[in-house]
Amino acid sequence: MKVASLFKDLSFMGQIEGDRRTYYVFKGMDYLLVSANGRDGFNVNVVDQEVPEVIKKKFAGKRVTGRMLADQARRPDLFSPGFSSLNALYVAGALGLARKLVKKQGRAMVFKIKGK
């Protein structure tokens, strides 16, 4: 993956409120980009375009955390423990496939995935 191609022809897809920041999702040629609204710099995370469809198919109607996504999706190529799973949930939320719940599971954010 080349950095120049990541930023070519980006389209704004949506945004979602995290606990502390607003996250913006952009669609590029091959990837989705997640960027937090930060005052000190610019940070971008790359999410595979296949992720929203996998979340919709495997978790429709369920409440999930990033950890649950990594453990239960059976797709280590797309979801790993840590921030990649959380970024995947931010993408799902920004695209309207999920919503972030106020309720938490321990310290983890919980997302409700829309039904089929």
Annotate each PLM feature:
Residues 79-97:
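Short amphipathic alpha-helical interaction segments
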Residues 98-102:
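Conserved hydrophobic residue
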Residues 105-116:
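Short, cationic-aromatic polyanion-contact patches
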Residues 1-55:
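Long, low-complexity, charged/polar intrinsically disordered regions in eukaryotic proteins
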Residues 3-6, 25, 87, 93, ...:
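Basic, alpha-helical nucleic-acid-binding regions used in initiation and control of genome expression
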Residues 46-53, 57-82:
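Short acidic, hydrophobic short linear motifs in intrinsically disordered regions
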Residues 26-27, 103-106:
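Generic beta-strand structural signal
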